[in-house]
């Protein structure tokens, strides 16, 4: 059974930890993320972007796949299925398909349009008891072909969005998607604290991959209740595949090293290990 993110994020906010949000890209990813969550006894937000959703062949594959894995793996921790950086139409489609949570990314729109569409989606989400994450201030970096320059969120706009009572708020706080450059200025802690106090909402740290652990922990202490991870899992997966091939294990015909079940075993475990590390960092271990 899938749950929304409202209760898990409120608990995280009250007890000063963060719930990990891990983007999935295929079956192995979904299985690895759920396996790690069960091992760590951590609540988990299984997420997919619209690009990954298309790659996996759509809602009709992703929703039953995640639900089926929850049952087959006997997952007992809270699991939310979340749409990451959804468009207005994408959010509506995800809600109709059975996603338990959505993030509407209207940050690139004029603020009033973002506000109006956010309000409409919150009302729509209530019909299926789904949760809604909203965004103010574009995030830097690239996400599924959408490039953001990155900007610091406006406090007044955050306050206005908060009147809609979303379940979580993603705000531009100096974070970016993908790998952080050497000249990255870092997170704006004063802004995190100010937004947390002004909105009283669980805050979301997008682009959580590559931020120094001490910085993440400080941000969690100031009000971050959801940590988004994608790039680090991708890097771990790619590294394990490269090591397997460089060791020429795929050429071992005697042991059928070319079998995809063998080739993908260590990369899938690499995702599990990465997720376990992030759950420790979030402080979500043993919180389910």
UniProtKB/Swiss-Prot annotation:
UniProt: Zn(2+) 2 binding residues: 105, 135
Binding site for D-glyceraldehyde 3-phosphate: 49
Any one GO cellular component localisation term in the record: cytosol
Cofactor: Zn(2+)
E.C. no: 4.1.2.13
Free-text remark on how the cofactor is bound: Binds 2 Zn(2+) ions per subunit. One is catalytic and the other provides a structural contribution.
InterPro entries hit by this protein: Aldolase_TIM, FBA_II, Fruc_bis_ald_class-2, Fruct_bisP_bact
Keywords: Glycolysis, Lyase, Metal-binding, Zinc
GO molecular function: fructose-bisphosphate aldolase activity; zinc ion binding
Binding, dihydroxyacetone phosphate: 178, 207-209, 228-231
Catalysed reactions listed for this entry: beta-D-fructose 1,6-bisphosphate = D-glyceraldehyde 3-phosphate + dihydroxyacetone phosphate
Pathway: Carbohydrate degradation; glycolysis; D-glyceraldehyde 3-phosphate and glycerone phosphate from D-glucose: step 4/4
Biological process (GO), any one: glycolytic process
Superkingdom, taxonomy of origin: Bacteria
Disulphide bond pairs: none
Binding site for Zn(2+) 1: 85, 177, 206
Entry annotated with the keyword Lyase: yes
PROSITE patterns per UniProt: ALDOLASE_CLASS_II_2
Summary of subunit composition and partner proteins: Homodimer.
Function (record text): Catalyzes the aldol condensation of dihydroxyacetone phosphate (DHAP or glycerone-phosphate) with glyceraldehyde 3-phosphate (G3P) to form fructose 1,6-bisphosphate (FBP) in gluconeogenesis and the reverse reaction in glycolysis.
Family in the record: Belongs to the class II fructose-bisphosphate aldolase family.
Name the UniProt record assigns to this protein: Fructose-bisphosphate aldolase
Gene it is expressed from: fba
